[in-house]
A protein has these predicted regions:
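An acidic, low-aromatic, low-complexity terminal/linker signal
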Residues: 1-139
Length: 139
C-alpha cells in the first residue's frame, strides 16, 4: 500500500490484531467498569477516565468468538461516528506493542472490518477498522 506506518499491536486470545497508532490514545489497566442499561451491541459498560465517560466496547466476541480469555487492559482508541469522534475502551488480553510496518491490502477471505495486513515473523496480523466493525456489529 504505502511506506511503513505505526501500529499498536494487541493480543486477543492466541491471535494479535492491530490499530493504526494515530487512533490510540492510551493503554490503561482494568479499572472499575460501570455497568449501565443500554442496547448497544458489545458495549459492556463505561469507564470514567480523566473526566471523560468512555464506553467499553468488547470486540473480542467478533474477533475470536465467545470463549476469549479474560481481558487485562483497556486500549483507549478514537472512533469516528460520521463527523463526530469519541474515545472507546477496548478490552485486550495482554500487553500491547508499538511497531512500524508496511501495511498490505487484505486478501479476499478476510472479514470486511480488516483494512490491511501486517507481516510479522511468525504471524500475519489483521489491522482493524473500528468504524467498519461497528457497522457490522450493529447490522
Amino acid at each position: 500500500m504505502s511506506a511503513a506506518s505505526s501500529f499498536v499491536l494487541f493480543p486477543m486470545g492466541e491471535k494479535h490484531y492491530a490499530l493504526p497508532a494515530h487512533r490510540v490514545t492510551e493503554l490503561a489497566r482494568v479499572d472499575q467498569q460501570q455497568v449501565i442499561p443500554h442496547t448497544t451491541p458489545f458495549v459492556t459498560g463505561v469507564l470514567v477516565r480523566r473526566g471523560e465517560v468512555i464506553p467499553v466496547w468488547d470486540i473480542a466476541p467478533s474477533l475470536v468468538g465467545p470463549d476469549a480469555p479474560a481481558r487485562k487492559f483497556y486500549l483507549i482508541a478514537r472512533r469516528r461516528f460520521g463527523s463526530a469522534e469519541e474515545s472507546t475502551a477496548i478490552p485486550v488480553t495482554g500487553d500491547c506493542e508499538l511497531l512500524n510496518r508496511q501495511m498490505t491490502a487484505p486478501v479476499a477471505k478476510t472479514a470486511p472490518y480488516v483494512e490491511g495486513l501486517l507481516a510479522l515473523e511468525n504471524e500475519v496480523v489483521e489491522v482493524i477498522n473500528l468504524e467498519t466493525l461497528a457497522a457490522e456489529v450493529a447490522s
